[in-house]
Amino acid sequence: MRLSDFYTALRLALVLPFFALYHMSRWVVMYFPAANVGRVVSIASVLLFLFIACTDFLDGYYARKSGKYSSFGKVFDPFADVIANVTVMLCLVADNFMPVFLFLCILYREFGMMFLRMLACGEGHVVGAQRMGKLKTASYMGAVLFSLLLKALYAFELAGADWYERMRAVGRLVYVVPVVLALASFFSYLKTFFPILKRVCGRTRYPVCKTCREWD
């Protein structure tokens, strides 16, 4: 296994531990009401997320350093990004840090990208992450980190309740930026996939799809 693929696999492996850690405080309180683990959990969640974000940087760094880009890595890296980002955002939706509507916009965008990638693979093409896609992922991580740090500040009583609620409202607006970049990157990817869509939709076994032929 290449070192870049190892870091991608590590990122994927840390997703469920993050989910469990994020919800640990409420699970512990259910069985041990006197326990107060909120501070430990909040700071540990921030640190684990930062490590997950570092693996995203490291896999790209070592791939560029070695100059070796495998078809597997081109598919595996964006797949791990999707699983990690969607799982972390789901945690924040549960705590009302992220609006459900914005989460659904991102989720549907990722489903759309998965469909396009599968379609491309069926045609023998592997399309890796583009610069716009990486920018989108960076905006995901920035918005998530803002929410996690805000939660940690409140857990350590470094933020008052009024200020905390105001910043939570600001945090919800912050997620508009990742959604805009996600949609922009989706349309950017469509330009790459367009020749493949034309070829697939132009076949007689797909007679119902005329849209691509009409775009000639």
UniProtKB/Swiss-Prot annotation:
GO biological process per UniProt: phosphatidylglycerol biosynthetic process
PROSITE patterns found in the cross-reference section: CDP_ALCOHOL_P_TRANSF
Keywords: Cell membrane, Lipid biosynthesis, Lipid metabolism, Membrane, Phospholipid biosynthesis, Phospholipid metabolism, Transferase, Transmembrane, Transmembrane helix
Domain of life: Bacteria
Major subcellular location class: membrane
TM segment ranges: 40-60, 88-108, 141-161, 176-196
The protein's Enzyme Commission number: 2.7.8.5
GO CC annotation, single: plasma membrane
InterPro entries: CDP-alcohol_PTase-I, CDP-OH_P_trans, CDP-OH_PTrfase_TM_dom, CDP_ALCOHOL_P_TRANSF_CS, Phosphatidylglycerol_P_synth
Reactions listed under catalytic activity: a CDP-1,2-diacyl-sn-glycerol + sn-glycerol 3-phosphate = a 1,2-diacyl-sn-glycero-3-phospho-(1'-sn-glycero-3'-phosphate) + CMP + H(+)
Alphabetized GO MF terms: CDP-diacylglycerol-glycerol-3-phosphate 3-phosphatidyltransferase activity
UniProt-listed Gene3D superfamilies: 1.20.120.1760
Compartments it resides in: Cell membrane
Membrane topology: Multi-pass membrane protein
Pathway: Phospholipid metabolism; phosphatidylglycerol biosynthesis; phosphatidylglycerol from CDP-diacylglycerol: step 1/2
Pfam families per the UniProt record, alphabetical: CDP-OH_P_transf (PF01066)
Signal peptide: none
Record's function text: This protein catalyzes the committed step to the synthesis of the acidic phospholipids.
Family: Belongs to the CDP-alcohol phosphatidyltransferase class-I family.
Protein name: CDP-diacylglycerol--glycerol-3-phosphate 3-phosphatidyltransferase
